[in-house]
Every structure is written in structure tokens, then in C-alpha cells.
């Protein structure tokens, strides 16, 4: 085991040294080097002290002077709480939570609980189970106001409180975002996703099996509706039952936003999943304009328009566009006239045709194998052959392109090639329905921006760990979703800060850089001190972009009253439970 120095020369000509603890491991005839720890940039004296300390641990002889040297006892994350606290102050969330909870009989720091769980979603890798978050929070170098140690039960008790504060929290965040980013909620995007749990979930009224965006139809789930601005900042969200249809959520969301936010003019943008006669009536009655995606499988008038061969397209916003007026019927039998922006996209055609071909190939291979099995006598009765054929077509989404015949020890199939060819030709066409007087290019660009909400769902599921959900009551599930959305808000605010500061990096990489800013606990002559690790110029620029100007000053203020380093991994919630588990 040894300490390795790695020198890196930057484009500006300066050289920097980074140190790692390396262990040599022999595997057969080879000796592989394994990195045990990365120390980052250290001074020569710190390297010598580390070497002496490791020598002491290994039982090697060292100079007597080592008794008076400093000893590194551990480190804590300092960049994480500073980052979270900065955005909390920008949004005045600490003031909001203190004010909202002033009349509640809460015996723990609600602001600290919010900060810890948001920080965990943004920075902590691995499971988001409350017990692991409760353990992980000890590694954070917090502001002196976080004096009490949050218990596992405090984090659980905070979730229903956050869920109950959601409506006023949404209104508070909307007001602050208008002030900070000068956002204009004249164009909002609405979409839904689902999130499943692995368990019976019999206690829940929300967890119900339904259409799963994650292809987990075997699991119970919730449906999450999210409204974001053109900048991708969340405005409002709701947790629905797992079997709620997309088209049955729009009425509630539109009326709720109209009542609480007093939006006079607003254009709602949604995909084809929200298009229905009922929802068209909802949008017209709300007084808001709309841009709704529509495929060939919705209104017959739209289907007929998309299949018209003599359409005259023109190139607008990188796609072929043709505008028509069509009459649509609402749920009350009333007829309306709206604009149909018919779009023919080569990129969409290529992608959709590739998806269709992949699904067709799966059925082709399945039927070919089934035919071979019947010929070899594996399936003999008509019933067995019929069941096997339906299994091949089940969930393939291409059943209409095939037909088959079967009998005793007989099976044959045929593909409808003309229908497949026609479908591939129409694959790049879709329509946008609107009554807005916007220019065609603005309508198309507005609909393309709908990708921002899809990006929000991707970030929450992949980066912020919306799953797994370990909660055993519906109100805690709603609190969990609220924390995920707030974490995504911080994520988007960081992205906008990077764009404003013209820093060529992603929010994910920026979060990793912030995580590397640490406070080191040092003991010298039985006295404990905190030191701030050296910060690179790139990290200083990053901190400046998000509004943190003097990190050392903040650290010195926090370190004055910070307790000595102390961390013990906690495996159980209470000492009594630990003893109980030991005796089993």
C-alpha cells in the first residue's frame, strides 16, 4: 500500500498534483493496483502526515515527532449543504416552511428535514430508503442552525406535512420563480408518467395496476401529472390513482391552476394522449388556448386529413407543414372549427418505421418458430396451437398486420404487406390541433418544447431516484413525489445558472463537482479543527455562477460552532431494535 502522486498539466501551463491511496493486489502472475481513496490536491506536508499515519496503522516505526503531528480523523461534505442552502435562500423556502409550520406542534427542525431529503435526492447514490438517508445525513457539514440530530422517525413524520403544504408551496414557488427568472407562464406543458412499486400495496388507494410507462404491468403504480414552463421549471403536480386515464386528468389540473394562479392568458401544450372530446370542451370552457398533438388514431376527421394524398407541404421549422381547417365534435355534440397543422417529418417517419419493423420481426420470428414446432409435432391440438399463436401476438402492437390459419397439427400465417407499406408511408405524419392565432412556426416550436417535460420525468426517474418508493401510506407517497419535484426544480435552476454563466458543463457533472468540496476534520494535540480542502478554479467559477461568492468565509462562519467529527454507521433505528436483532 502506498500513496501515489499524479501530476496533471492544464492548458494554461500550470501543473497540479493529485494524490491517491493505492493497494497492490496480486492476481495470478499479474499485480493489479486498486485505488482505495482519492485525496485530491494536498500539500507536501499533508502527504507526509498521511504517510506517517498510515505507517502507524500498519504498525511500522515512525519518528517520535509524529506524536505531535496533525491527524486526519475524517471528512464531511461541505459543498452539498452550501449548494442546497443557497437555493433554499433564493426561493425563500426556509422562511416559507417556518411560517407554514408555525402553528404546528412539531418537535424537530422541519427545514433541516427538507434540506436533508432534497440533498439526498440530488447527491446521494444508491437507494433512497429513509433509513439510509438518515444514516447519510451524518456525513454533511451543515450550517450551525442544524444542531439536533434528525431521527428516522422525523424524516417519516415530515413527509405528510410536506404533502399537506403542497398547494401553498406551489403558489410560493411560482411567485419566487417569476422574480428570479422573470418567467412568463403564457405557455405551459402538461404530461403524465407512472411510477411502480414492487409489493402488494393493499393498504393504498392510489397504488392500482394500470397502463405502465415503464412496461411493468405486473406491478401496482401511481400516475404523476406535471405542469412545467417553457424553461422546464415545474409549476404544479398531482399524484393520481394508478389506473387513471391521461384524458381524465386535464380537467382537474386546468381548473386548479386557473383558480389558484389567476392566469389570464395561457396556452396549454400536451401530446395526443390528452386529446379527447371531453378535454377539447374543457380547454374551450377554461378560456385558455391549446396546442394538442393528434395522431391518425384519434378523430376520424384528423385521420382523413393526414391520409389525403394531394396535400401541398411547405418547409417550416425543418419539417414539411400543411395547414387546414377541420370541424370537430365535442362531447356535448357541439361542432367547433379549429386549425389542424399537418406535419410530415422525415425523422419521425424513420424512427416510427424502425419501431414498427422491430415489432414485426418479433412476430415473424415467433410465427416461424411456432410453424416449425407444429410440423415437428410439439403442438397437436387446435386449442394448443391457437393459444401459442395468441401468445406471439400478445402485446406486440402489430396484430392487425397478420392473419393465421390453424387446425390439428396445422399452422400457417400471412403478413399484410400492403397495410404495412401504407403504415410506413404515413408514419411521419401527425397533426397539431389549436385555435390559437400564433404563427405556424411558433406553434411547431412550442410543441417541440414539450420534450422538456419528458426530460423532467427522465431526470426524476434516473438521476433523482423517484424509485424505489418505500412508503406505506398514500400521504407519504405524495410527500415523496413532492421532494422529487423540488429536487428537480433545484436541478433545473442549476442548469439555468450554468447557461447564464456560460459554463460548458451539464448539471450532473456540476453536482459531482460540488460533491467533491469537503471539510476535513483534523486533530492536533487532542484539539479538533476543521479545514477546507483546496478548491479548483473551475469549482470556484461554478460556485460563483450559482451565487456563492466567498466559500471560505461561509466555511469559517460554520466551522466556529461545528462539533468535532463523529460518524458511526447506523444499521437500526433504535438501540432497543439493535439488541432485539442481535438476540434473534
Model-derived segments and their meaning:
Residues 2-5, 11-13, 17-20, 28-29, ...:
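Anion-binding and metal-coordination hotspots
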Amino acid at each position: 500500500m502506498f500513496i501515489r502522486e499524479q501530476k496533471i498539466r492544464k492548458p494554461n501551463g500550470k501543473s497540479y498534483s493529485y494524490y491517491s491511496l493505492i493497494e497492490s493486489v496480486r492476481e495470478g502472475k499479474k499485480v493489479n493496483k486498486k485505488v482505495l481513496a482519492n485525496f485530491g490536491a494536498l500539500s507536501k506536508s499533508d502527504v507526509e502526515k498521511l504517510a506517517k499515519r498510515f505507517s502507524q496503522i500498519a504498525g511500522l516505526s515512525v519518528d517520535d515527532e509524529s506524536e505531535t503531528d496533525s491527524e486526519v480523523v475524517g471528512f464531511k461534505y461541505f459543498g452539498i449543504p452550501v449548494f442546497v442552502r443557497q437555493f433554499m435562500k433564493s426561493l425563500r423556502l426556509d422562511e416559507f416552511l417556518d411560517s407554514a409550520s408555525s402553528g404546528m406542534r412539531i418537535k424537530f427542525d422541519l427545514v433541516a428535514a427538507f434540506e436533508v431529503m432534497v440533498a439526498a435526492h440530488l447527491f446521494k447514490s444508491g437507494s433512497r430508503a429513509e433509513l439510509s438517508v438518515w444514516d447519510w445525513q451524518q456525513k454533511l457539514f451543515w450550517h450551525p442552525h442544524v444542531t439536533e440530530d434528525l431521527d428516522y422517525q422525523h424524516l417519516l413524520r415530515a413527509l405528510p406535512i410536506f404533502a399537506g403544504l403542497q398547494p401553498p408551496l406551489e403558489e410560493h414557488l411560482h411567485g419566487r420563480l417569476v422574480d428570479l427568472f422573470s418567467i412568463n407562464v403564457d405557455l405551459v406543458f402538461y404530461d403524465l408518467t407512472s411510477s411502480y412499486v414492487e409489493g402488494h400495496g393493499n393498504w393504498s388507494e392510489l397504488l392500482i395496476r394500470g397502463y405502465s410507462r415503464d412496461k411493468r404491468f405486473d406491478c401496482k403504480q401511481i400516475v404523476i401529472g406535471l405542469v412545467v414552463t417553457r424553461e422546464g421549471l415545474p409549476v404544479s403536480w398531482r399524484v393520481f390513482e394508478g389506473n387513471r386515464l391521461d384524458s381524465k386528468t386535464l380537467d382537474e389540473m386546468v381548473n386548479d391552476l386557473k383558480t389558484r394562479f389567476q392566469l389570464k392568458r395561457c396556452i396549454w401544450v400536451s401530446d395526443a394522449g390528452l386529446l379527447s372530446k371531453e378535454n377539447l370542451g374543457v380547454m374551450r370552457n377554461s378560456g385558455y388556448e391549446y396546442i394538442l398533438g393528434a395522431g391518425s388514431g384519434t378523430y376520424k376527421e384528423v385521420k382523413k386529413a393526414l391520409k389525403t394524398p394531394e396535400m401541398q407541404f411547405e418547409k417550416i421549422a425543418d419539417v414539411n407543414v400543411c395547414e387546414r381547417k377541420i370541424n370537430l365534435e365535442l362531447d356535448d355534440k357541439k361542432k367547433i372549427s379549429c386549425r389542424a397543422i399537418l406535419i410530415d417529418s422525415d425523422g419521425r417517419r424513420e424512427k416510427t418505421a424502425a419501431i414498427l419493423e422491430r415489432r414485426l420481426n418479433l412476430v415473424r420470428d415467433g410465427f416461424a418458430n411456432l410453424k416449425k414446432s407444429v410440423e415437428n409435432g410439439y403442438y397437436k391440438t387446435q386449442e394448443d396451437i391457437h393459444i401459442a399463436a395468441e401468445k406471439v401476438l400478445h402485446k406486440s402492437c402489430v396484430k392487425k398486420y397478420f392473419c393465421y390459419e390453424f387446425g390439428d397439427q396445422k399452422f400457417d400465417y400471412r403478413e399484410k404487406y400492403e397495410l404495412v407499406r401504407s403504415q410506413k408511408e404515413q408514419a411521419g405524419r401527425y397533426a397539431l390541433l389549436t385555435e390559437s392565432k400564433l404563427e405556424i412556426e411558433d406553434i411547431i416550436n412550442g410543441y417541440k418544447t414539450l420534450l422538456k417535460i419528458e426530460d423532467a420525468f427522465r431526470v426524476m426517474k434516473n438521476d433523482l431516484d423517484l424509485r424505489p418508493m418505500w412508503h406505506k401510506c398514500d400521504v407519504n407517497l405524495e410527500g415523496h413525489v413532492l421532494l422529487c419535484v423540488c429536487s428537480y426544480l433545484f436541478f433545473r435552476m442549476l442548469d439555468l445558472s450554468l447557461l447564464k454563466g456560460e459554463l460548458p458543463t451539464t448539471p450532473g457533472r456540476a453536482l459531482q463537482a460540488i460533491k467533491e468540496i469537503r471539510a476535513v476534520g483534523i486533530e492536533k494535540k487532542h484539539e479538533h479543527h476543521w479545514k477546507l480542502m483546496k478548491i479548483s478554479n473551475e469549482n470556484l467559477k461554478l460556485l460563483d455562477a450559482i451565487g456563492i461568492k466567498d466559500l471560505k468565509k461561509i466555511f469559517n462562519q460554520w466551522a466556529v460552532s461545528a462539533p468535532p467529527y463523529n460518524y458511526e454507521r447506523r444499521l437500526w433505528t433504535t438501540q432497543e431494535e439493535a439488541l432485539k436483532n442481535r438476540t434473534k
